[in-house]
Amino acid sequence: MPAETVVFGTVFMDCKGFAAYRYDPLGRNVGSVRFIHGGVGRNVAEDLASIGAKVSFVSSVDDSALGLEVLNRLKNEGIDVGHVRRAPSSGMGLWLAIMDQNGDLAASISQMPDLSIMDEIVRSEGESIVAGCKNVILELDLNDHISTTVLSLAKRYGKKVYGITGNMEVILRNRPMLGGLECYICNETEAGRLLEREIPTREPEAALALLRGYVDADGLKSMVITMGEQGSVYYDAVSAESGFCPSIPTKVTDSSGAGDAFFSGTVEALIRGFPLGQAVGYGTRLASWTIEVAEPTRTLLPGNLF
């Protein structure tokens, strides 16, 4: 059976250091270091599969033992990897991250994969991939050509597109592309760059007013701003539904996968027909479950999300 949702995104190999005690950026820190499968697109594909979605992943990996390990894990989760290409080098990105004693990100450096590999997949197979699915999830900051081509194909074939942020650069150069999304989800830092002002995370009503104003002025359909432990605000311009969703108190082990999990839970709920406010609640729950573990995804969930 064809996948209902296609995810266009990256694979990274994460090298994470977890500080055992208070993190000192200028000194030596005792803790543990782990290599973990990551990447926004990969995380989202795995998150979606864990909550029952039928997913196909479009990406690239290295033609190496690590690349094969990534593919096998995705296959074992029931994800279609027929559109993941193996490249001699630079098929995957690298992310060096330091997590402080509370499990929050303290510092990081990332190295992007060679996006020309995915560019070629989109050129040669993009039309058939988009035509054959029901929904598209797009990591928006791959490059201008990939993002605009996928959005154009989705519009041609009447597919809904849900966008997640990588690093904002493509979005800031192509702001009108957000109007082609069914829903755009970003965090308060990304929203601040987009709106060109700081998001008042401790004042939900003020944050919501900014969100409504931006969405209406720029013609977006719906948008969600996540604000970490301060919760999230959401606005659906089509139904006029808006509101604030509090976070769930959680013992944090690793917060780095929270945004991808929130996105995945929210989008899958929207695909299943839930209104935005309810969908954001499901996203919040999945993020809460995910940050309890020392990986960016949680394949064995403590219960059913829906």
Regions found by a protein language model. Give the residues of each.
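Beta-strand->loop->alpha-helix junctions that form or flank phosphate-binding loops
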Residues: 58-63, 82-92, 166, 224-227
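Conserved phosphate-binding/catalytic region of the ribokinase-like
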Residues: 1-6, 29, 170, 202-306
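Structural alpha-helical scaffold elements that stabilize or flank donor/cofactor-binding regions
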Residues: 128-129, 176-177, 216
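Conserved phosphate-binding/catalytic loop of the ribokinase/pfkB sugar-kinase fold
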Residues: 86-87, 97-135, 140
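Conserved beta-alpha-beta core of the PfkB/ribokinase-like small-molecule kinase fold
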Residues: 135-209, 230-231
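Short, conserved phosphate/pyrophosphate- and ester-handling motifs at nucleotide-, phospho-/glycolipid
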Residues: 48, 187, 259
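Glycine-rich phosphate/adenosyl-contacting loop at the front of the ribokinase-like
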Residues: 1-79, 95, 251-252
